[in-house]
């Protein structure tokens, strides 16, 4: 199995549940080049890992991180954030 195969190429941003348990979950996210996961918040701390591609994570506190394959960023709860696909990107969000 491959994370990339979970997503359709036609959606600019795609989020598919990868794993769920009573204690947390993982979501596979694909962002196509030039597209953006729009501004939103999370109620729980999260970890965003870049599997493939290049994306930029930003939040309302001025944090800006370029994510390449293997890079990750922690996401604070109740802080607006967004992610832009500089290249087609495969990411995993763990909460």
What is each model feature region?
Residues 1-23, 27:
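A short, N-terminal "cap"/entry segment at the start of jelly-roll beta-barrel domains
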Residues 88-95:
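A short hydrophobic beta-strand segment most commonly corresponding to one strand
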């Amino acid at each position: 199995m491959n994370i990339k195969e979970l997503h359709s190429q036609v959606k600019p941003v795609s989020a598919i549940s990868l794993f769920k348990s009573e204690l947390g979950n993982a979501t596979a996210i694909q962002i196509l080049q030039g597209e953006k996961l729009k501004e939103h918040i999370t109620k729980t701390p999260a970890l965003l890992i870049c599997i493939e591609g290049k994306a930029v994570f930003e939040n309302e506190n001025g944090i800006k991180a370029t994510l390449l394959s293997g890079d990750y960023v922690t996401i604070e709860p109740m802080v607006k954030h967004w992610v832009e696909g500089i290249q087609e990107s495969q990411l995993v969000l763990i909460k």
